[in-house]
């Protein structure tokens, strides 16, 4: 018998609003998702699609002008939307759900040594003595690839490179022993070579510690190399969801087609790369129909009038597009992403997607 997958976090119909200059900006519009224990879920989409805002609702880190206006978030039987005080969130934030941010310098205290910042977390979350915490901290530093960790334990953040600082942030997250690790664009500020190293490190640690991961990115190349499931976000909604193989090889929403078409590895022989026309809609307005319709070559009249429901493609794959309605005209996805399986094998080398 196959082991039944354990859903550890369930978000239902989440709406997040921000008060901005006497207006209301709706950043998340009715998002629902389930997080399965041990899996890596990638949240992908353009900047402003709501990826980071959504995960902030899981850790109580919305800005002061933001609020969850609707919906529920169940984490292992606990309603996170009922938490209000900093003390309430202390039991969840870091201890159960930890976050690695894009810029490691926003996570590190510049006037404290690296070692003191790691040991502080170990003492708080693991209840170790100072001596035990130092030994563990050096062990974590070694695990994340810090050379000469014994000596560098007493150095300050400014003495570390950007890539090494990000490794320290990962070490601090590990020291919390989280159940869920949110990686919010953790490689964006790093050069390509260091990005690959950090991704490999996260994959290795995920395999060793078996924590559940939410990986936020706009880079589908990263998604292909690390994710089990993919949620494609646009204008505060999830418009397509499936396994990484389903989203890459059998995408159904026109926005997903556009994202895949813009993969740098799919540039033509002249080096020309597809870019999505237009700009995302204003989130201050009440969006009617499919928010992507104005930018889509495949939009039908109904896309401008009614929001599409979830159409199931398989037990694990769905998309919100009227193109999946039984009466919709049959259209072909863009030629550039046709036979994507072969192109991935030939040009992109994502091992777990190439089979």
Curated annotation (Swiss-Prot):
Start and end residues of each ABC transporter domain: 9-260
GO cellular component: plasma membrane
Pfam (any one): ABC_tran
GO molecular function, one term: ATP hydrolysis activity
InterPro entries linked: AAA+_ATPase (IPR003593), ABC_Ni/Peptide_Import (IPR050388), ABC_transporter-like_ATP-bd (IPR003439), ABC_transporter-like_CS (IPR017871), Oligopep_ABC_C (IPR013563), P-loop_NTPase (IPR027417)
Keyword set, alphabetical order: ATP-binding, Cell membrane, Membrane, Nucleotide-binding, Peptide transport, Protein transport, Transport
Entry's Gene Ontology BP terms: peptide transport; protein transport; transmembrane transport
Membrane topology listed for this record: Peripheral membrane protein
Subcellular location: Cell membrane
Coarse class of the protein's main subcellular location: membrane
Residues that hold ATP according to the record: 45-52
Matching SMART domains: AAA (SM00382)
Recorded family membership: Belongs to the ABC transporter superfamily.
Function noted in UniProt: Part of the binding-protein-dependent transport system for oligopeptides. Probably responsible for energy coupling to the transport system.
Name of the protein in its database record: Oligopeptide transport ATP-binding protein AmiE
Organism encoding this protein: Streptococcus pneumoniae (strain ATCC BAA-255 / R6)
Species lineage: Bacteria, Bacillati, Bacillota, Bacilli, Lactobacillales
